[in-house]
């Protein structure tokens, strides 16, 4: 009977001991660059759109945006990765669209294949 009780208890203890590193506030974030896998320009009806494909780490970092454990520079690092892959994205309004996706895409539509940025959209600043 002891063996029957000890085995499940040992299994439970090992599971409880396997807490992810992110659960320890002193260990830092559980994500790291690269945040962007690749980008791709596409055209629909004469309008261009930049598809940004985040990495799993990018998705994790974006979900942390605005929380106590978040890296406040993560969105800037990710935007730098976008510009490294698609320098033409450096136009008015594109960074604001990216930051909007960074903050809300994984909440509104988790796991969406790409975050789509459109340079033809009106420029909206943070105050709007």
Please give the residue ranges for each predicted region.
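A broad, low-specificity signal marking well-ordered, structured residues that form hydrophobic/aromatic
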Residues: 21, 50-51, 115
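Extracytosolic low-complexity repeat regions of secreted or lipid-anchored proteins
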Residues: 78-128
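Acidic/histidine-rich, surface-exposed loop or edge segments in extracytoplasmic proteins
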Residues: 48-87
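Extracellular/periplasmic catalytic domains that process cell-envelope and extracellular macromolecules
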Residues: 44
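Charged, amphipathic alpha-helical regulatory modules used
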Residues: 39, 48-52, 56, 124-128
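N-terminal prepro-regions of secreted/extracellular proteins
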Residues: 1-39
